[in-house]
């Protein structure tokens, strides 16, 4: 697009957004490249009008999340960034079974806080829930809290309303939705923008946290593999290496923790005890388990700066031991958290504890 068309397109967009448009070139924090402008829509109609202009002048659009993703697509070259901060409406509906509908700018923790008084929870939500938004995490199709039972986020989105390039709005479900959400796409590859999502929920008024300590990484890995192979009906399963355990103020050694519905206790308690004993783990008291559970959002708490050293790796169960050893080669002070999915995939987030200032905690 030549400069004359750039100017024409920007004038059309400014006519839609007024002072909610910031002209560029704009280089947003945690993005790569430069965009022509940033806009902040307040409703779906404005997104449709923006997409019409984008289609007419053939420039890309990219949603700008809350900056919690460590591998999100960058700013589109000669395109427009879309902030959804002003589109954060949350609606809860249903009787015996609830569902929640949210706009892309809604923070995940706000959804949880709205569901909690009803005794319900999201089936899956990110460990960065205090900051992450619905649209931002949906773009990464992540693994998070609840993925041991429910899998990836896209498997738990009942439907999503999207605005395609050109301005058409469609509702996507199932495989069509999963094809639309493709982590790793550049802004230029994006087919459109998510403007709303209906999310799966679960009963959560009697969840039971648990935690176990391990001295050696091979024992931790063995316990994880055993729980997965046995199909123990946990809702969530995660682990920390010694660096992350210290950063969270939870002691030393390796920590395996998670949660399950109380009604499953007859199936779970014995399986946990047997697994931990056979892999030289120590089941921790309830108070310590609840404390570990309460720290599940670290290091994305609102009071802490966004980490700068994170590396995100997805590994199969069979390569976990090797991946944990490799973190020591990349940093003298690694701090690792792992999330286990029902597929056997494990999401590793590796940080440099010294760079983040956690060695002083």
What are these regions (language model features)?
Residues 30-35, 93-97, 204-208, 250-253, ...:
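Short glycine-enriched loop/turn motifs at secondary-structure junctions
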Residues 89-93, 102-238:
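FAD-binding subdomain of flavoenzyme oxidoreductases
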Residues 23-25, 213-216, 221-361:
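C-terminal substrate-recognition/cap domain of FAD-linked oxidoreductases
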Residues 1-29, 53-61, 66, 274-292:
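N-terminal accessory segments
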Residues 69-74, 81-84, 190-198, 266-270:
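Short, acidic (Asp/Glu-rich) active-site segment that either coordinates a divalent metal cofactor
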Residues 23-87, 104, 122-124, 350:
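Glycine-rich N-terminal segment of FAD-binding domains in flavoprotein oxidoreductases
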